[in-house]
Amino acid sequence: MAKSRRDRNSWGGFSEKSSDWSSEEEEPVRKAGPVQVLIVKDDHSFELDEAALNRILLSQAVRDKEVVAVSVAGAFRKGKSFLMDFMLRYMYNQESVDWVGDYNEPLTGFSWRGGSERETTGIQIWSEVFLINKLDGKKVAVLLMDTQGTFDSQSTLRDSATVFALSTMISSIQVYNLSQNVQEDDLQHLQLFTEYGRLAMEETFLKPFQSLIFLVRDWSFPYEFSYGADGGAKFLEKRLKVSGNQHEELQNVRKHIHSCFTNISCFLLPHPGLKVATNPNFDGKLKEIDDEFIKNLKILIPWLLSPERLDIKEINGNKITCRGLLEYFKAYIKIYQGEELPHPKSMLQATAEANNLAAVATAKDTYNKKMEEVCGGDKPFLAPNDLQSKHLQLKEESVKLFRGVKKMGGEEFSRRYLQQLESEIDELYIQYIKHNDSKNIFHAARTPATLFVVIFITYVIAGVTGFIGLDIIASLCNMIMGLTLITLCTWAYIRYSGEYRELGAVIDQVAAALWDQGSTNEALYKLYSAAATHRHLCHQAFPAPKSEPTQQPEKKKI
């Protein structure tokens, strides 16, 4: 059974604290703090700490409550954890008018610090889930998530995309933390990350994500757009506006963002002051922060977390509980742990790939057009040696054309695309060989000729063996002859009607295999030998006495 107690906490107020961390049995009281639930390993793979998530989301007090998941994401070293700790102060002191606390008290909660190196990795969740009464009286669970900053020096683009996408998929309120302005590259990165998240989700006809809040820190143009939500709304409307005179690429970015989120808003926040930015020993005391920042901070946090602003997490229109959120967490991380999704690429890599693929396509098209001129559909049959010679010449020209195109990525990067070009040209050459062979009347007649030879040979052997009393062999030859005759008729019907083409291909392959057992001369020699044997056996069986004197000189002549 859960125990509750009112404790003075480090955020300057009193709050109800629950010590129930398990759905099965009571455990000792644990101090609330950040818990790493998504771990990014050194090999850039991802691991979910299911035990930690179970303790947080399956607590008896919250597991069946509908959940509001608030996440802060954005570039590293832009104050995300710093902001999260003020959210914690508000959640612990909502009933207090001066919820920001003592001006001399250090800021604690999620780990943060000044400097240029990253602090948070993966995804962290505050271990205590807050129970809040909404305006309609429904009690909901509020989960606070802090995320690893994007584009730090130790993370790949896939790391950044996965963490951002996963936090967006899990959260009902995603705060996109930006510095100074909303630039075009910020929107492009948002497009990439949200698309990476949408790929991992099941197909839905609804907008896949809920609330997106652009939080612009260190806003320096209050004379254009005032601090706060109103100025932010006007600024964002201008920034995300789609107009006809925009380039198609810019329009697509904005349309994509609008198609992904149900609600989009913006808040402009001033700079916290030089002491915060330059003092290496700054520990979050309010007395060192500019008054203008504190004034707007007192507006921002309630604007984000007040009961009327809390959006319950929904997936495909269904409200999600803490228990359900745990299952989605597990399902989503399995997708990102696998190889089903394409790996996102840097702009340079994507551009270099497109550049090289375009060069491959151009060179391949050149080869194709010139080979069509040599042995295309209306061209006569070309000797195989001449065709091969022309192929080698045009292949060399295509490779030279590929190498002559200016490409991004360097020689090493382009080498595999050169190999791809050569491989595709060789495949085209095989098709041209088949097309050229089909124009050869002797090649086209190979299948019926082979079948006729088989029929004739089996007919002769059947006659001879039947005559000398080897009825079993004769019957076998007759059966083979009959089957071959049926095969020949079937092949003729397939060629005439165009039906059962797969069966026709099998017949051609069998005939080709028989043909390849020997040249045409060898086949004719076998026919001649069979005929001569048949004639010799007939003379032995039916001697002609009157003819013997005349035959004797003939034998001598031979």
UniProtKB/Swiss-Prot annotation:
Start and end residues of each stretch annotated as 3HB (three-helix bundle) domain: 347-438
Binding locations of GDP: R77, K78, G79, K80, S81, F82, Q148, R217, D218, V276, N279
Q: Which domain of life is it from?
A: Eukaryota
Q: Which Gene3D superfamilies does the record associate with it?
A: AHSP, P-loop containing nucleotide triphosphate hydrolases
Membrane topology summary: Multi-pass membrane protein
Query: Which residues does the record give as GTP binding sites?
Result: R77, K78, G79, K80, S81, F82, R217, D218, V276
Q: Which keywords, in A-to-Z order, does the entry hold?
A: Acetylation, Cell projection, Coiled coil, Endoplasmic reticulum, Golgi apparatus, GTP-binding, Hydrolase, Magnesium, Membrane, Metal-binding, Nucleotide-binding, Phosphoprotein, Transmembrane, Transmembrane helix
Lumenal membrane side? 471
Q: Domain GB1/RHD3-type G: where?
A: 64-309
| Catalysed reactions listed for this entry | GTP + H2O = GDP + phosphate + H(+)
* Example of a GO biological process term: endoplasmic reticulum tubular network membrane organization
Modification type Phosphoserine: residues = S10, S22, S23
In its record, the post-translational modification comment is: Phosphorylated. Phosphorylation, by different kinases, of the N-terminal hypervariable region (HVR) regulates the ATL1-mediated membrane tethering step.
Region: Disordered, residue numbers: 1-28
- Identify the residue ranges that face the Cytoplasmic compartment according to the record: 1-449, 493-558
Q: EC top class, in one word?
A: hydrolase
Residues binding Mg(2+) are S81
According to its UniProt record, the EC number is 3.6.5.-
Q: Where is this region: Autoinhibitory domain?
A: 521-558
CC terms in the record's Gene Ontology section: axon; cytoplasm; endoplasmic reticulum; endoplasmic reticulum membrane; endoplasmic reticulum tubular network; endoplasmic reticulum tubular network membrane; Golgi apparatus; Golgi cis cisterna membrane
Quoted from the entry, the domain comment is:
The N-terminal hypervariable region (HVR) regulates ATL1-mediated membrane tethering by organizing ATL1 into a lattice structure on the same membrane. It does not affect GTP hydrolysis or membrane fusion. It has no effect on the GTP hydrolysis and fusion steps. The GB1/RHD3-type G domain mediates GTP-binding and hydrolysis as well as homodimerization.
Purpose? Atlastin-1 (ATL1) is a membrane-anchored GTPase that mediates the GTP-dependent fusion of endoplasmic reticulum (ER) membranes, maintaining the continuous ER network. It facilitates the formation of three-way junctions where ER tubules intersect. Two atlastin-1 on neighboring ER tubules bind GTP and form loose homodimers through the GB1/RHD3-type G domains and 3HB regions. Upon GTP hydrolysis, the 3HB regions tighten, pulling the membranes together to drive their fusion. After fusion, the homodimer disassembles upon release of inorganic phosphate (Pi).
Give the record's family classification.
Belongs to the TRAFAC class dynamin-like GTPase superfamily. GB1/RHD3 GTPase family. GB1 subfamily.
Assembly, in brief, is: Monomeric and homodimeric. The homodimer, transiently formed by two molecules on opposing membranes, is the active form mediating ER membrane fusion. Interacts with REEP1, REEP5, RTN3 and RTN4 (via the transmembrane region); these proteins are involved in endoplasmic reticulum tubular network organization. Interacts with ZFYVE27; both proteins are involved in endoplasmic reticulum tubular network organization. Interacts with ARL6IP1; both proteins are involved in endoplasmic reticulum tubular network organization.
Query: What is the protein name for this chain?
Result: Atlastin-1
The gene coding this protein? Atl1
